[in-house]
Swiss-Prot record:
Taxonomic source organism: Enterobacter sp. (strain 638)
Pfam families: MTS
Protein name: Ribosomal RNA large subunit methyltransferase G
Broad class of where this protein is predominantly found: cytoplasm
Function: Specifically methylates the guanine in position 1835 (m2G1835) of 23S rRNA.
Family of the protein in this entry: Belongs to the methyltransferase superfamily. RlmG family.
Catalytic activity field: guanosine(1835) in 23S rRNA + S-adenosyl-L-methionine = N(2)-methylguanosine(1835) in 23S rRNA + S-adenosyl-L-homocysteine + H(+)
Subcellular location: Cytoplasm
GO cellular component entries: cytoplasm
Amino acid sequence: MSHLDNGFRSLNLKRFPETDDVNPLQAWEAADEYLLQQLDDTEISGPVLVLNDVFGALACALAEHTPYSIGDSYLSELATRENLRHNEIAESSVKFLDSTAEYPQAPGVVLIKIPKTLALLEQQLRALRLVVTPQTRIIAGAKARDIHNSTLELFEKILGTTTTTLAWKKARLINCTFTEPALVDAQQMLSWKLEGTDWTIHNHANVFSRTGLDIGARFFLEHLPGNLEGEIVDLGCGNGVVGLTLLEKNPEASVLFTDESPMAVASSRLNVETNMPEALDRCEFMINNALSGVEPFRFNAVLCNPPFHQQHALTDNVAWEMFHHARRCLKINGELYIVANRHLDYFHKLKKIFGNCTTIATNNKFVVLKAVKLGRTR
C-alpha cells in the first residue's frame, strides 16, 4: 500500500498483483505526481482520457471528471477498479476502453503514461489524432530514462508541436499540441512467416516480440509435448504460436488461449483463423488475469512463457500468480510446462508450489521445466 497526495484527492493505492513485503513496489511513480501537478481542477472541460494508467493512480485522482481509462492491460483495469473501491470511489466514475476501441471525440485533456512498447504508443497516438483538437491539452509522462528522442519524434510526427520539461524526481513530461502534421499511413499489424511452417503470424501493436519469434519461445516450441488430450491452456498466449503448435501436435486436445492483453488475444484468434481454421472448434479465447474465475481441476496441461516485468518494473509477481492459478486449475496428474531465463530460478519456485519440478531441456540462456499436480492440497 502506498499513499499519494495530489491536488485532487488523497489516495491509498496498491499494486495488482500485490508485491510481497520483502520487495515492496509502490503503485504510483513521480510521473503520476508530475502529470497531476499540471492540471487545475477548475480548468478541465470536455472528456478526460487517461492512457496506460498501470494501477489507476491518475484515474482515481481524476474520478470527479469521469475519465476514460484506455490501455491494453486487463490487469491495469482490475488494479484501477480495486483502488477505486479501496478509496471509496464509485467504480462507475471511470469508463474503461481497450486500445482498439474508438476514443471519445474532442477530449479536453489527454494524459499518457508512456508504455514499454513503442508500437503501442504509436497506435494510441494515431487513434488520438482522429479525435483531438488544437485545444486539447496533451501531456505524457514517464521516468526520464524512458523518454527518448524516438519518443519525442513520434509525438511530433503524429500529433504536432512537442516540447519536454526538465526532470523532476527523475520524471519528465512531454507537452504536445495538435497541429495536424501530414502523416503517412503505417501498418498497424506486423506479419511474418514462422520458420519451419506454412504459417503467417499476425501481431497487433502491443504483442510481445511482434517483429519475430523471440528466442525463448523458439526454444519452447522445440520441446512442446505431443501426447496431450483433453483441455490444455496457452497461458499468457501473446500471438498464440505456442497454442497453434499445440493444436497441430495434439489433434485430440483443445486449447484455451488466454492473456491479460486484448491485443494478444485478438492476435491469437486471428492466427488460428488464418493458419488453422479447421481447429477453431477446438479453441477458446479469453482476456483474463491468468486463470481467475476458471474452475479448478479442469485442465490436463498448462503451458506458459511467463513475463518477468510489469510495464517498466522488473517483478516475478505476475509469473508467481500464473503458477498458482495453473496448479489450482490442473487436474490431478496435470502438467505445467514453462520456459524461462535460467537466472530466474523458477525451478525452486515451482518445486515450492507443486512439490516437484523436472528440467526438460536447457541451453546457455533458457530452461524448459515441468511440474506435476500430485495432490489436492494447496
